[in-house]
Amino acid sequence: MSLHLTLVLSGKNLKIVVESINVVTARSERSSLLDCKRCCKRPNIPHTETVDFVWGFNVETRLIAAETQSDFGRKHPGR
């Protein structure tokens, strides 16, 4: 499962853009007890169920130099 988004965090001279977040899921089997009403001899029958869970994620970022007022004046004269 992948989630792609753009998140901009502005600092004084730095912007961090999150380009993508990859969430890794895995399937795991765990044992539990099933209360089986049909079975009279063994009311609790152990069985295995499959569970999805998140075990890690990866975040890709890139850094962008933010424009300061002095940079803006040099790039756009007359403003």
Curated annotation (Swiss-Prot):
Q: Which domain of life is it from?
A: Viruses
From the Swiss-Prot or TrEMBL record, give the protein name.
Answer: Uncharacterized protein 092R
